[in-house]
């Protein structure tokens, strides 16, 4: 039995993943249904990170997104999700498709139509992130359009270029875009979820704009591969009960995030299906004309 469980977040304090994991941990700790859960922020490159995953006692959990799939598909030398044990999916955070403030006739339908006519006519930024690349590829796959992709080292650089009017459209977090949209610095085109966001309720969904499909950042927790199934199921149960607490849903909604719970088996199938779907999407993209990338 674990006296306490460390929930390792490979991002800084205050990041979206950190906020979501702390909300869950605090909800579980208040209920007192199991060992105390402590959120630990550790970078992937640190020696401490390696020590954590050398432990097989089930007392360490790892917060993750679909980046485990995206990173491996981009570089087969990267760890694959199946090296770990899926415990539970916890949340889904839709994204916001936006246009620069000065773009005329800025609707998603108009932007897509323009890109379909001329793939070099609509510029979009992309950071050097495999997960961000998959989100952009999802938008292209759903619309059939190809955009003129400008590559940046970081998401912050790409976002700054969008605000400066150097790009036509972008895919950003709903919370990051809210203030910019309200101040007319950006124009909201669509949210990438099935339902409208409570953060920006006036913004239509992709479906409302005539586009079938959704994409989002999905967060969950993993354990070491050797963690006993019984222990993984017990831990998942704590998070499942927390997911049913209305106050948690309200708290996450402030960040444009929806509570979505999947247990160990369902979360495993989720990763299997996501890997297959993204591999097929990559093959479809490769079968079409090479996208122009400018750095």
What are these regions (language model features)?
Residues 1-83, 120-121, 128, 132, ...:
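N-terminal (or domain-start) structured segment
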Residues 2-3, 142, 229-295:
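An extracytoplasmic/periplasmic, membrane-proximal ligand-sensing/linker region
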Residues 59-61, 78-96, 123-125, 208-212:
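A structural signal for short loop-to-beta-strand junctions that line the ligand-binding cleft
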Residues 69-76, 90-104, 137-142, 218-221:
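Periplasmic solute-binding protein
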Residues 92, 106, 177-244, 273-276, ...:
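C-terminal lobe and pocket-closing loops
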Residues 99-120, 203, 209:
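Flexible hinge/capping segments at coil-to-helix
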Residues 62-68, 91, 126, 154-155, ...:
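Beta->alpha turn/N-cap motifs
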């Amino acid at each position: 039995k674990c006296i306490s469980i460390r929930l390792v977040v490979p991002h800084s304090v205050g990041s979206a993943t950190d906020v979501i994991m702390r909300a869950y941990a605090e909800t579980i700790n208040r209920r007192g249904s199991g060992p105390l859960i402590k959120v630990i922020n550790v970078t992937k490159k640190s020696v401490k990170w390696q020590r954590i995953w050398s432990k097989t006692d089930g007392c360490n959990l790892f917060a993750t997104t679909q980046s485990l799939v995206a990173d491996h598909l981009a570089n087969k030398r990267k760890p694959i999700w199946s090296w770990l044990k899926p415990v539970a999916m916890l949340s889904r955070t839709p994204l916001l498709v936006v246009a620069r403030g000065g773009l005329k006739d800025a609707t998603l339908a108009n932007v897509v139509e323009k890109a379909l006519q001329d793939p070099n006519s609509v510029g979009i930024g992309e950071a050097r992130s495999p997960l961000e690349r998959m989100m952009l590829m999802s938008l292209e796959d759903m619309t059939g359009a190809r955009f003129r992709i400008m590559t940046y080292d970081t998401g912050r650089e790409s976002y700054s270029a969008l605000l400066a009017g150097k790009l036509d459209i972008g895919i950003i977090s709903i919370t990051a875009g809210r203030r910019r949209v309200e101040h007319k610095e950006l124009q909201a085109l669509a949210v990438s979820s099935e339902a409208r966001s409570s953060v920006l309720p006036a913004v239509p969904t992709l479906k409302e704009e005539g586009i079938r499909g959704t994409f989002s950042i999905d967060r969950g927790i993993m354990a070491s591969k050797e963690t006993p199934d019984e222990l993984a199921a017990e831990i998942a149960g704590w998070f499942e009960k927390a997911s049913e607490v209305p106050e948690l849903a309200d708290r996450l909604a402030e960040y444009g995030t929806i509570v979505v719970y999947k247990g160990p088996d369902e979360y495993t199938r989720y990763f299997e299906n996501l890997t297959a779907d993204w591999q097929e999407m990559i093959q479809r993209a490769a079968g079409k004309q090479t996208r122009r990338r400018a750095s």
